[in-house]
A protein has these predicted regions:
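Cleft-lining beta-strand/loop regions that shape enzyme active-site pockets
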Residues: 27-28, 32-49, 60-63, 201, ...
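Conserved PDZ fold ligand-binding element
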Residues: 31, 35-39, 61, 211, ...
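Low-complexity, Gly/Ser/Thr/Pro-rich intrinsically disordered linker/tail segments
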Residues: 568-594
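Amphipathic alpha-helical substructures
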Residues: 41-74, 220-271
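Bacterial Sec-dependent N-terminal signal peptides
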Residues: 1-20
């Protein structure tokens, strides 16, 4: 009887251990993020993202063989020496505080952007001076953070400068580097090495720990997106612990990236991307390529239309199946791994994911219905380059009925002479109205043209850089862009019209926000995507994370994210209109001008 009972008990050990490990790693993940970003150890200021990854791996590797609380204490001994663990919430502050001996870490934005001479995101150690900003931590106070059941981390985000040890900090990174280097087999081939890293649960736990913390502490739209990110952490840790990534096969690498995309899909940020980079320290850098069927597509609510192809497929045919699976089912499945703020844009992104693969030399079977109603199939080998266009290229400048049409998103609009060419056309043709097409990504050279559309100063205050010095975005402040766009002569007085749809995002939306805010013209079409502001990047050994780094809103503070710029005149484009060669948006605009 006892033997039977013992057998039954042992049969539950793997499940219990799995749940216990998830809780342990969840507690570790929270502690790691708080110490990394909000304990002001100035000796770590020159550490880069990969250094921090190695340190995270070093401590995560200890969990399982050691009590989680002991691992967190060991981590705190270097990164936050005056922090302590308690089994219930504590309230504590230092006495007789001399402010000038304390410091805190201030994050102005997060991540990094690679633009010469432009550094909008940075972190710095601030020496306390007795003054208190809205975002700064209280000097000498231990803030209490719940890590798990009866497990609390008490940490000073404003701490004494001399409590941190350079020797201990340097030794920690040295030990972390040694452990990382031991992961590689000098005799192994590249792909085997990469697969073995993804097979390593400690690697996966470290990776998802950092990815969770980035959103938790820095994503500027966490509130607007309604993210219950706290509850996502155990889900992510559970995924990291799953044996689905323990397979010693090439597909494990691809499956892992897809899992990351799915984990981030609740985030509604059209800039968000899990790129294909593989840059493991100690291994050659590679990029996980994506291959596409040679189809240029247009996306509508009820169908996908083939605009052009590298195959003998009639233009205007409707795509119905990919390798035997209904296109709508494929789009639905792909949408689960896409971060978008606009449903139409989400469908468009999923449409191109539907005709892509990470497998070199893959062959897809395309099923389609011709304009005559005949169902046909074609087989095609996928190519490295994504199909470029949804539309036939147009001239940058067109004229009809004394209306100047400026196609801002055409490739030739990005030539350096765009501004001069526009001003020359304007003077020579003296149009009665101007139509600017921003259905896509417009040329940056349009920036100067904006200043000719107004006779008043225009504020750049749509954009705010988050300022954080405490975890969980507590007491977040903002650095508002105080720049001003000055009017330029000659002032353009003829009516201006702007065409928009879901393809207008980022810089295109900034243009439309100026138009709307300062009444520079009339917007026709459908709403823009709802994502603008400079991007930022976080570096990982594999699959860098890219997302929006700034917070954008209208000048009165009202929300833009996820809503976009609403047109003054709404005009929807149907598949039938498109197939008949009609641009009903521009047709309606011209009709109203006349």
């Amino acid at each position: 009887m006892i033997k039977h009972a013992t057998i039954v008990f042992l049969s539950f050990i793997p499940i219990f251990a799995m749940a216990q490990n998830t809780d342990d790693y969840t507690s570790f993940a929270k502690a790691y993020g708080i110490m990394r970003y909000y304990s002001p150890n100035h000796h770590t200021e020159n550490w880069n993202d990969v250094d921090w990854f190695k340190v995270g791996y070093y401590f995560a590797d200890k969990i399982g063989d050691n009590q989680t609380e002991d691992v967190i204490k060991e981590m705190a001994a270097v990164l936050a020496p005056e922090a302590f663990i308690s089994n219930k919430p504590k309230s504590k502050s230092a006495k007789n505080v001399q402010s000038e001996t304390y410091q805190y870490r201030l994050h102005t934005g997060s991540g990094s952007i690679s633009v010469s001479g432009y550094t909008p995101y940075y972190r710095e150690i601030i020496t306390c001076n007795g003054e208190h900003q809205e975002y700064s931590p209280e000097t000498g106070r231990w803030y209490c953070y719940e890590l798990g059941d009866r497990l609390y981390l008490n940490l000073q985000s404003s701490a004494r400068r001399d409590c941190f040890s350079k020797e201990d900090t340097d030794n920690l990174l040295l030990e972390a580097n040694r452990l990382w280097e031991s992961l590689y087999d000098e005799e192994g081939d590249y792909m085997s090495e990469v697969i073995s890293i993804f097979n390593d649960r400690t690697y996966r736990v470290t990776d998802l720990t950092i990815r969770w913390n980035i959103i938790q502490h820095f994503y500027p739209y966490k509130t607007e997106d309604g993210l219950d990110w706290e509850s996502q952490l155990p889900v992510m840790i559970g995924k990291a612990m799953s044996d689905e990534f323990d397979k010693v096969e090439r597909n494990t690498v691809f499956a892992y990236r897809e899992m990351l995309q799915e984990m981030y899909s609740p985030i509604k940020d059209a800039h968000l991307d899990i790129d294909g980079s593989l840059s493991f320290p100690g291994l050659p850098a590679r990029y996980l390529a994506q291959y596409y069927a040679p189809l240029a597509l247009s996306c509508f609510e009820d169908c996908v239309i083939i605009e052009d192809s590298g195959l003998e497929i009639e233009k205007g045919s409707r795509l119905t199946k990919i390798s035997g699976t209904d296109i709508e089912d494929v789009i639905k499945e792909k949408s689960q791994r896409i971060s978008q703020t606009n449903k139409t844009a989400e469908r468009w992104s999923a449409m191109y994911e539907a005709i892509s693969t990470v497998e070199r030399d893959s062959v897809m079977t395309i099923t389609y219905i011709t304009p005559a109603g005949e169902e046909k199939t074609a087989k095609t080998k996928c190519a490295l380059n994504r199909p470029v266009t949804m539309k036939t290229p147009k001239a940058v400048f067109e004229k009809t009925d004394n209306i100047l049409i400026v196609n801002l998103c055409e490739a030739e609009a990005f030539n350096e002479d765009f501004y001069e060419s526009f001003m020359k056309r304007l003077e020579e043709e003296n149009p009665k109205a101007i139509i600017f097409d921003v259905r896509g990504y417009p040329t940056y050279y349009f920036e100067k043209v904006l200043s000719h559309l107004t006779d008043k100063d225009m504020s750049n205050g749509f954009f705010r850089t988050p300022l954080t010095a405490l975890p969980d975005q507590k007491n977040m402040g903002y650095e508002v862009n105080t720049g001003v766009r000055k009017p330029m002569e000659p002032h353009i007085t003829v009516p201006c019209w702007f065409l928009a749809d879901y393809r207008a995002m980022s810089w295109a939306e900034t243009v439309l926000m100026y138009v709307k805010e300062y009444d520079l013209g009339t917007i026709v079409g459908t709403p823009s995507t709802g994502t603008t502001g400079d991007i930022t990047q976080f570096t990982f050994p594999a699959f860098n994370l890219i997302l929006t780094g700034l917070h954008a809103a209208w000048l009165d503070g009202s929300r833009h994210h996820g809503i976009g710029v609403e047109p003054d005149i709404r005009v929807e484009v149907s598949a039938d209109d498109h197939l008949n060669g009609r641009d009903v948006v521009i047709e309606e605009t011209i009709r109203r001008i006349q």
